[in-house]
């Protein structure tokens, strides 16, 4: 059985070093897709690079935890900025869901304005779209616009409640991260997906060159390790040997 493999690099637009790392992993490695932070400091640079790579699938990386929102969000921001206090608000069930829905629509339009096209798919920074309160908003939005959505099925409370016309990969993995950034780890992810009989799989990654913005991230130098592994010739060969076809979210 032919299986589609989407290797999606998150954080396009975060910094020039991030952008260049993603492009390097696409041109000379196994990355096939990326998602962009429309409020990132280097989003215009990302859009410029993407025009040189029309086959690179570019989706939207919905962000509610970093930087300035596109719209006014007095119920979620502090001093005009987004932050990780969203987790506490989710636990307390005090999320401003109307503001979040409006911000999603605004970020989507911002993506179209910057990139000049619709995004191929939708996911989010720090996976906030998988919060139980936020997921229905994002799932409806993606289904209405006919774009695919990253779904971590281990965290969806009831998969039967998903919109029938919502597209996603059958499998998703965030395991290629942190201490487990090795070719062996990547291949274990593929083998586990194949064992489950999944016809499509998304593997999340964050390849980057380190610059001043990336140095401020808690997840800094591992991004360089990711880039090294993802551009390995042996990894590309091993993926092909397992019968996976590289693709984007337009292929599912």
UniProtKB/Swiss-Prot annotation:
It is found in: Cytoplasm. Mg(2+) binds at residues 61, 125. It is an enzyme of class 3 (hydrolase). SUPFAM superfamilies: Glycoside hydrolase/deacetylase (SSF88713). One of its GO terms (cellular component) is cytoplasm. Its main location: cytoplasm. Its EC number is 3.5.1.105. Pathway: Glycan degradation; chitin degradation. The keyword Magnesium applies. One of its GO terms (molecular function) is chitin disaccharide deacetylase activity. Keywords: Carbohydrate metabolism, Chitin degradation, Cytoplasm, Hydrolase, Magnesium, Metal-binding, Polysaccharide degradation. It catalyses: N,N'-diacetylchitobiose + H2O = N-acetyl-beta-D-glucosaminyl-(1->4)-D-glucosamine + acetate; diacetylchitobiose-6'-phosphate + H2O = N'-monoacetylchitobiose-6'-phosphate + acetate. Its cofactor is Mg(2+). GO terms for biological process: chitin catabolic process; diacetylchitobiose catabolic process; polysaccharide catabolic process. CDD domains: YdjC_EF3048_like (cd10803). Homodimer. Belongs to the YdjC deacetylase family. ChbG subfamily. Involved in the degradation of chitin. ChbG is essential for growth on the acetylated chitooligosaccharides chitobiose and chitotriose but is dispensable for growth on cellobiose and chitosan dimer, the deacetylated form of chitobiose. Deacetylation of chitobiose-6-P and chitotriose-6-P is necessary for both the activation of the chb promoter by the regulatory protein ChbR and the hydrolysis of phosphorylated beta-glucosides by the phospho-beta-glucosidase ChbF. PANTHER family: CARBOHYDRATE DEACETYLASE, YDJC DEACETYLASE FAMILY MEMBER. This is Chitooligosaccharide deacetylase. It comes from Salmonella paratyphi B (strain ATCC BAA-1250 / SPB7).
């Amino acid at each position: 059985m032919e299986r589609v493999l989407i290797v999606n690099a998150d954080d396009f637009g975060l910094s020039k070093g991030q952008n260049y790392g993603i492009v390097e992993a696409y041109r000379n490695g196994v990355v096939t897709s990326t998602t962009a932070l429309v409020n990132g400091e280097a989003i215009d640079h990302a859009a410029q690079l993407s025009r040189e790579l029309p086959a690179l699938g570019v989706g939207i990386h919905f962000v509610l935890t970093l930087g300035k929102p596109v719209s006014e969000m007095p119920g979620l921001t502090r001093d005009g900025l987004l932050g990780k206090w969203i987790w506490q608000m989710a636990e307390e069930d005090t999320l401003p869901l109307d503001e979040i829905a409006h911000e999603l629509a605004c970020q989507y339009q911002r993506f179209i304005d910057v990139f000049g096209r619709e995004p191929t798919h939708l996911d989010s920074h720090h996976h906030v779209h998988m919060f139980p309160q936020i997921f229905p908003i994002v799932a409806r939005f993606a289904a209405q616009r006919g774009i695919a959505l990253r779904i971590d099925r281990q965290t969806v409370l009831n998969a039967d409640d998903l919109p029938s016309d919502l597209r996603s990969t059958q499998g998703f993995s965030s395991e290629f991260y942190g201490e487990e950034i090795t070719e062996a780890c990547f291949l274990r992810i593929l083998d586990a997906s194949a064992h489950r009989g999944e016809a499509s799989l998304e593997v999340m990654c964050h390849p980057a060159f380190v610059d001043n913005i990336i140095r401020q991230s808690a997840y800094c130098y591992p991004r360089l390790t990711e880039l090294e592994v993802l551009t390995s010739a042996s990894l590309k060969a091993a993926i092909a040997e397992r019968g996976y076809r590289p693709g984007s979210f337009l292929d599912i």
